[in-house]
Amino acid sequence: MRIRVPATTANLGPGFDSCGLALTLYLTLDIGEKADSWYIEHNIGGGIPHDETNVIIETALNLAPNLTPHHLVMTCDIPPARGLGSSSAAVVAGIELANTLAELNLSKEEKVRIAAEIEGHPDNVAPAVLGNWVVGAKLDGEDFYVRHLFPDCALIAFIPKAELLTSESRGVLPETLPFKEAVKASSIANVMIAAILRNDMTLAGEMMERDLWHEKYRSKLVPHLTQIREVAKNNGAYAACLSGAGPTVLVFAPRDVADTLQTSLQTLEIDADVLLLDVEGSGAEVFR
């Protein structure tokens, strides 16, 4: 059996801790034979555990403590600590592992709820489970969210080789915002969401680059954001914004400029991968 969970990008600029979009990069988990103890073979390195302290197995055992150990093989295209939802993908993979082996018959809504409890908010986990674009909120311990089709466009991910921990990126954010600035920030997010619902990526893109919640504070940790926005604008893109907490920058563009834009971004003197992606529409899947 195989479990596949997509990468996700959160925020899309002003949709801070609320908007998320599934992307065509994947964490794939192959479930092998039963074993005396849990072992997860993977291609990540970097101190990621191979035993039951691995997030995937830990999550599964929290849901189903009596699971029989198996040999697992994980292949992950989602680089860690880059703002592409690697931790959310691991959590969702663990939920799917427990659901599959213990035959829990969890609904998608239950999977989102469990994952959001673990991660703290639904912005990455909801699109990882459901696919496509999700707008959500966690209020008094309850999750509220709406899934909708994202407008057709090209997505170009500029993924620096250097990591940026979410904890570090959150550390530069202020504890509070002045009321007038918060109202303005909220109105920007509202217009962005309305524009996406209307398939107006030109207006949505303008709002994406006017975020007041987090990007101006995080830009000091991601100095390449300004360069990428300039290249994106010069090549006809709709917008470029931080993916999650960064350092990845996601560029939204018409499909007919995607190849040229990708080539232009590859010429920047920054050690990075530049990938042409799509919106992932299915979310987490199990192949039997």
From Swiss-Prot:
Pfam families: GHMP_kinases_C (PF08544), GHMP_kinases_N (PF00288). GO terms for molecular function: ATP binding; homoserine kinase activity. It is an enzyme of class 2 (transferase). GO terms for cellular component: cytoplasm. Its EC number is 2.7.1.39. It is found in: Cytoplasm. The keyword Kinase applies. It catalyses: L-homoserine + ATP = O-phospho-L-homoserine + ADP + H(+). InterPro entries: GHMP_kinase_C_dom (IPR013750), GHMP_kinase_C_sf (IPR036554), GHMP_kinase_N_dom (IPR006204), GHMP_knse_ATP-bd_CS (IPR006203), Homoserine_kinase (IPR000870), Ribosomal_Su5_D2-typ_SF (IPR020568), Ribsml_uS5_D2-typ_fold_subgr (IPR014721). Gene3D superfamilies: 3.30.230.10, GHMP kinase, C-terminal domain (3.30.70.890). ATP binds at P79, P80, A81, R82, G83, L84, G85, S86, S87, S88, A89. Its main location: cytoplasm. Keywords: Amino-acid biosynthesis, ATP-binding, Cytoplasm, Kinase, Nucleotide-binding, Threonine biosynthesis, Transferase. GO terms for biological process: threonine biosynthetic process. Catalyzes the ATP-dependent phosphorylation of L-homoserine to L-homoserine phosphate. NCBIfam families: thrB. Belongs to the GHMP kinase family. Homoserine kinase subfamily. PANTHER family: HOMOSERINE KINASE, HOMOSERINE/4-DIPHOSPHOCYTIDYL-2-C-METHYL-D-ERYTHRITOL KINASE. This is Homoserine kinase. It comes from Listeria innocua serovar 6a (strain ATCC BAA-680 / CLIP 11262). The gene is thrB.
